[in-house]
Amino acid sequence: MGSLQTPTNLSNKSCLCVSGRVVKGLRVERQVGLGFSWLLKGRRNRKVQSLCVTSSVSDGSSIAENKNVSEGLLLGAERDGSGSVVGFQLIPHSVAGDATMVESHDIVANDRDDLSEDTEEMEETPIKLTFNIIFVTAEAAPYSKTGGLGDVCGSLPMALAARGHRVMVVSPRYLNGGPSDEKYANAVDLDVRATVHCFGDAQEVAFYHEYRAGVDWVFVDHSSYCRPGTPYGDIYGAFGDNQFRFTLLSHAACEAPLVLPLGGFTYGEKCLFLANDWHAALVPLLLAAKYRPYGVYKDARSIVAIHNIAHQGVEPAVTYNNLGLPPQWYGAVEWIFPTWARAHALDTGETVNVLKGAIAVADRILTVSQGYSWEITTPEGGYGLHELLSSRQSVLNGITNGIDVNDWNPSTDEHIASHYSINDLSGKVQCKTDLQKELGLPIRPDCPLIGFIGRLDYQKGVDIILSAIPELMQNDVQVVMLGSGEKQYEDWMRHTENLFKDKFRAWVGFNVPVSHRITAGCDILLMPSRFEPCGLNQLYAMRYGTIPIVHSTGGLRDTVKDFNPYAQEGIGEGTGWTFSPLTSEKLLDTLKLAIGTYTEHKSSWEGLMRRGMGRDYSWENAAIQYEQVFTWAFIDPPYVR
């Protein structure tokens, strides 16, 4: 391995991270996006102090030494001995420095020749590719979470790190003055500052770091992330400066691999950026428009991951100048609304759409299920981007999200009344009767108990359940619904509980332990979503032996296999029921099939339970599929060079 050179403007202090731990003191200043003439002015032939870390090939040990080098300035980036970039700015350059790098590579080559002689007769073993992966995300559990995005970016990085990859997650450091601030208690200030030029001003950001579960969790610190509310808004709605907040995140994330000496080494230039949803969609654009023209990140790749295409980061066209992109790149993000969607006759419909830009320039595109990857190429599911996505279908893939199999495990779950497993289902009955008792329902182990867990809104199909309840209540069943959302649905749930006191229970709000108990105690889980990119509740349900009934859409269609009692020589196959079209009549028909199977065919029902519990929806399984897409990304040259 060649020598690794840290940024040239280091002080004599030190702040290297060793095995994820930080020694405080070093301050590294980075100027991002400065003009050529500004950086040249008054900085020619200066003396700089640099720290070289030369790695030993044989044992991985490192030797650090200080060198005073008289260097001229060239446009580009400072590079370490292996050719990786250390900070994007005008860099010192010297013939002597280049010669040193060549010599170090020659030494490595000689060492390799010696090693090859000693190992000629050794059997060749397959080499597993490993990657430097940078997740860029608006949320990552347990630090920040509002939905599935937080789950993915909190769990998938750890699964990839466990498989040998070097993984960094870059997200904002949200502080709202409440108990949630404690989640960042172990994050240490790296004392590294980057100056980002966007929105017509220079913004300084800091970086905090925690090394946990093999992952470098990096948090971008700025005053715009310090306010009450969620990552996106408060009780009054979405924050008006979200475009600014996530533009800042994207710029900072692009600098992080170059300037943060995590574990003593920067991630360097050859890495893979995984930009999640519109909040991070500017990253592929910055790589293509701002960095690669100057030879920086020429070996990097970018993947945009679409968790919900309904959210695209659309803003007025006049805000383009705020993004920090060159003027000639406007066409990449230009988005014009159709005439019928404009506010008035003089409205040109012209906007900027950063997700559109990411789809246009990223090396590959991912969604959170195979079904959703197809749906977003249709006019019904693409939200205006279907034609662009169809044009890039050759690099579009879907990978089903995993679940935390430790947190969601019926044999160890601390929230449920009795533990059970695929080999011993007896504890599930105890979970059911305990749930009935907790909710104040008649304790009836043989009565089908139907559950719903989710947001109370149109997308989740709550109106379909509302229409079906009067007829469903005529059957011998019990129903429990947990969720919050639109007031009309919350009021309807309370009213329905008063009408059917022995059959219906409403829990308005959200409670994690209760969601576990409903998942374990119910026999059937309803998910009549209009669209569902992936969905997690159906995966939790199957792991707990609860049978999902879902609308045939997106990830629901991918993960729930229809029950066929006649397959496998009468043993049956499938893990639940899907239905389409999305109507209350079709939902009721499917429920009647399920209830009939539950009451009259116990062995078939037990088979459904065991097959669902036996499915592998772990993050490790998902990580293997992500590795394949990463490999494909590096087979081809960058899509935009």
Curated annotation (Swiss-Prot):
<feature type="binding site">
    <location>
        <position position="145"/>
    </location>
    <ligand>
        <name>ADP-alpha-D-glucose</name>
    </ligand>
</feature>
<dbReference type="GO" id="GO:0004373">
    <property type="term" value="F:alpha-1,4-glucan glucosyltransferase (UDP-glucose donor) activity"/>
</dbReference>
<comment type="pathway">
    <text>Glycan biosynthesis; starch biosynthesis.</text>
</comment>
<keyword id="KW-0750">Starch biosynthesis</keyword>
<keyword id="KW-0035">Amyloplast</keyword>
<keyword id="KW-0328">Glycosyltransferase</keyword>
<dbReference type="Pfam" id="PF00534">
    <property type="entry name" value="Glycos_transf_1"/>
</dbReference>
<keyword id="KW-0934">Plastid</keyword>
<keyword id="KW-0150">Chloroplast</keyword>
<dbReference type="GO" id="GO:0019252">
    <property type="term" value="P:starch biosynthetic process"/>
</dbReference>
<comment type="function">
    <text>Plays a minor role in starch synthesis in storage organs (tubers), but may contribute to the deposition of transient starch in chloroplasts of leaves.</text>
</comment>
<dbReference type="GO" id="GO:0009011">
    <property type="term" value="F:alpha-1,4-glucan glucosyltransferase (ADP-glucose donor) activity"/>
</dbReference>
<dbReference type="GO" id="GO:0009501">
    <property type="term" value="C:amyloplast"/>
</dbReference>
<dbReference type="InterPro" id="IPR013534">
    <property type="entry name" value="Starch_synth_cat_dom"/>
</dbReference>
<comment type="similarity">
    <text>Belongs to the glycosyltransferase 1 family. Bacterial/plant glycogen synthase subfamily.</text>
</comment>
<dbReference type="InterPro" id="IPR011835">
    <property type="entry name" value="GS/SS"/>
</dbReference>
<protein>
    <recommendedName>
        <fullName>Soluble starch synthase 1, chloroplastic/amyloplastic</fullName>
        <ecNumber>2.4.1.21</ecNumber>
    </recommendedName>
</protein>
<keyword id="KW-0809">Transit peptide</keyword>
<keyword id="KW-0808">Transferase</keyword>
<dbReference type="InterPro" id="IPR001296">
    <property type="entry name" value="Glyco_trans_1"/>
</dbReference>
<dbReference type="GO" id="GO:0009507">
    <property type="term" value="C:chloroplast"/>
</dbReference>
<dbReference type="Pfam" id="PF08323">
    <property type="entry name" value="Glyco_transf_5"/>
</dbReference>
